[in-house]
Every structure is written in structure tokens, then in C-alpha cells.
């Protein structure tokens, strides 16, 4: 669709208002915050404000959505709306803030549609605390601010039945895993010096880290006897876990990816 003069004027003023909202950031931080189209990678050292950028980016997504990068005016926008925004840009009165944000928003996300993933529990707690201060407790509680494994567990507890598991699944620890593995090795009458339980478990763990299923692993074996047996063990191991309605730690992410790939909804 061809841009009109009204579109260009509206988009320019809207962008300026949104930039004004994040004027406390430096230029590079603000650029990252306002980038909403496609993936974004931020490389920065410790203490450079990465978490601040993440928090402010979430605020932008919640309040303005794609507004900063949208080139078109809303379909129902009027010249009066444009004049209002221009007046607000020049004199941002607090009592006009709500309407200005509404006129600048393009498909803003709802809090429960935002997911912010961290590596550690400490980082997740800090992120949640800062979100409470930034957007309020109610919205912060609705945002998915968790570690990878916590977020994946929440997804699995809700929808793992689509993979043939019950929602009451258990998570096997290292001792549970080893017990299952030893039983499998003995059932196959394999030399435990050649097929050490710990080494086999580590191999399977690496496969899961790389999102390689038992079937995919078996397809890569070719004429390698050792790998062929690992593929067989891997298949039996996953079958044993499923029969027990259990996952191991690596399955938490592996099964979540499988669930999302197989179910777009």
C-alpha cells in the first residue's frame, strides 16, 4: 500500500513521541528499545545497561507495540488526532498522556504475551523485581520472566499431553537416570566397560542439547557399531522414561521444542 502524506506525517510525529518517552536512554540503548521488527542481538559489557534495555523494551512493546517502526497511520486516524499528537509532542501534558499513548500504539502486546528468558534464577528474580517497579505488580506477574527451564516447565505442565505424557509427569534426577540406564544396558547384555552408563548418558544428553531425537540419531549412525548401539539405547531410554511418565533434565527444553514445533497454536 502506497504511503500518503498523512501517513508520513503521522508516523514521524508518533516516532518522535515514542522516542521522547525513552529520552533517558542513550542513543544506542534507545535504538535497541524501539526495534520491534525481527530478531535483535545486543552485545555489551557488564554494567552497560543490558537489563535496563530489556526492561524498557518490554515497556515499549506493552505500551506502543510496533508504533515506533510502523510507517502507516491508523486506518481510523483523523487530522484532529494528528494535531493532538503534534501539540502533545511540543507540550507533553500529563493529562494527555493516556490518549497520546493510545494514538501512538500499534498492536501493543498484552503482558501475558511477553516472554523474557534468563539463564539463572538470580537474574530471573532481579528481572521480575525491576518489572514490578516499571509496569506494576499485576502486569509484571503476567509477564513470563523466567529461566529457560522454568518457562519450559510451565509450557509442558500445560500442554505436554499433546506429546502423549500426563501433566503430572516427574523429573528424574541423576540417580533415577542411572538406574534406568543400567537396567537397559543389562537387558541388552552389553559390556558395561565399553558402554559405561555415565558415558552413554552424557552422549544422550549431548544429543538432546542439539535437539537430536533417537530416530534422527539412528539415521546418522551408518556403519558405526558403537553409535548404532547408542541409538538403540537412546530409543529404549526414552521409551522407559515415557512409560514412567517421566522426563530427565535435558528433556525439559528438548520436549518443549518438540511440542512447539508440532503444535503451532
Language-model-detected regions and their locations in the chain:
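Short helix-coil-helix linker/hinge
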Residues: 23-28
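Short hydrophobic/charged patches on amphipathic alpha-helices used for structural packing
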Residues: 30, 264-265
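Walker A/P-loop
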Residues: 38-57
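A basic/glycine-biased coupling hinge at the interface between accessory DNA-binding modules
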Residues: 2-19, 37-38, 59-264
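A cross-family signal for key residues in well-ordered alpha-helices
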Residues: 33-34
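A sequence-level detector for short glycine-anchored, His/Arg-bearing signature motifs
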Residues: 29, 46-47, 120
